[in-house]
Amino acid sequence: HTPLTQVAMTSTPRIAVLIPCHNEEATIAQVVADFRQALPEATIYVYDNCSTDATAAVARAAGATVRTEPRKGKGYVVRSMMRDVEADCYLLVDGDNTYPACHAPALCAEVLAPQPCDMVIGDRLSTSYFTENKRPLHGAGNRLVRWLINRLFHSHIHDIMTGYRAMSRRFVKN
């Protein structure tokens, strides 16, 4: 891994932390604070998607740039974020405090490296995610989808359903 501080660029890379949210009032302030600490040079965007709680207000108070997506659904939010935001590195995370921010610099460094990756995928499954997630059949479904995709595409992705991804500008804008 290339440390973020050693990435060679002609200017400071623009990093955007993108957080799609729907009713994340209870966790969004901590998510914004954690990613602000991990990536102090980043701009943090919270896209509120039809929340009925105070997600937007809490995110704004925590220092995030808040935008809204009126069409309900994560797909609409992600498309709007990718269209609206200009950056060299896009870090997609969820607003429910699922992903540890301490790994964000390493993910971004791979996208901003001299020989960059187009996308780096985070991995929840190597941690305590399955023991904490109590939804019935959720783990089995994730394992089945992961096995099928890895089998079909001859890949070795550990967490195919993760929302923790760093992406290059080239990947996002093409």
Regions found by a protein language model. Give the residues of each.
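A conserved acidic beta->alpha catalytic loop
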Residues: D48-A56
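Short, Lys/Arg-enriched N-terminal segments with co-localized hydrophobic residues
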Residues: H1-A8
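Acceptor/aglycone-binding surface of glycosyltransferases and processive sugar-polymer synthases
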Residues: P70-D84, A101-N174
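Donor nucleotide-sugar binding loop of glycosyltransferases
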Residues: E24-T27, S51, K74
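The conserved acidic donor/metal-binding loop of glycosyltransferases
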Residues: D94-Y99
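Cell-envelope/extracellular polymer assembly enzymes that use nucleotide-activated donors
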Residues: R14-A16, T43
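Short aromatic/hydrophobic "clamp" motif used to bind/position activated sugar donors
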Residues: Y90
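Short, well-formed alpha-helical segments that are part of the catalytic scaffolds
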Residues: N23-Q37
